[in-house]
Amino acid sequence: YKHLGGGALECIASRLSKTPKPLCFSLMVTSKCNCDCDFCFWKHKKGTDDMPKEEIIRLLTEAGQIGYMDSILWGGEPLIRQDFAEICKASHDAGLYTKIATNGWYLETNPDFAQYTDLMFVSLDAIGKAHDDIRHMPGICDKVISGIDYHKIHSPKMRIYVCCTVSTQTNFEQIKEVAKYCKDADILLYFTVNKAASIPEEAENVVATELENEQLSQMFVKIKEL
């Protein structure tokens, strides 16, 4: 039953109990990615070896046994893994409300994950070539939109959110276009902001794309008015 309603009722019940359960088990299943986003924390770690599938399945199984309620599977680009559907199945079978984060390139070529996934976050920072340029991946905007359309038809039980990263590489007009697309497609939209915070020396590329706090404040005032 925890897969119904986004697990909201169980989350509320857990928070109100004397022994609340841990909420979300976050797992980076690969560092590999076909994009080269300037604001990515992990772009310099693409050569790192991936955790074996068997180890990932063990961790997810134990997370379920411990009492975790949700999982979020991410990367890199998790759909690069040809065994990703098996990983999602392990999370689902462990009783976890299973979420994934993807750049959307492989949504149609590696689609089997969806039958075990409750919620998918897909990155879309602008519409058309502007998004391709931000992700340094020609054609990815078309792949995202086509992939979303595909899963709306073939995976109707999986909830879809669009994730728009706010940075120096996006402007309000581009964000408005993403918001219009989401409204027309009846998809929920949320925003992320990447900040290097305590490790600026390890993420100089992220620092270079950060908006100043005042700029962020002004941007989100405009976003709130959409």
Q: Which residues make up each language-model segment?
A:
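N-terminal pre-core extensions flanking Radical SAM catalytic domains
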Residues: 1-47, 64
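Short, flexible, glycine/charge-rich loop motifs used to bind or transfer phosphoryl groups or to couple energy/partner
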Residues: 15-16, 28, 61-62, 108-112, ...
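Conserved Rossmann-like nucleotide-binding pocket used by diverse enzymes
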Residues: 25, 29, 72-74, 161, ...
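Short strand-loop junctions, especially beta-strand C-caps/beta-turns
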Residues: 43-45, 76, 163-167
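Conserved Radical SAM active-site core
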Residues: 46-101, 105-119
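Radical SAM enzyme [4Fe-4S]-AdoMet core and its adjacent flexible, acidic
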Residues: 94-97, 116-119, 123-226
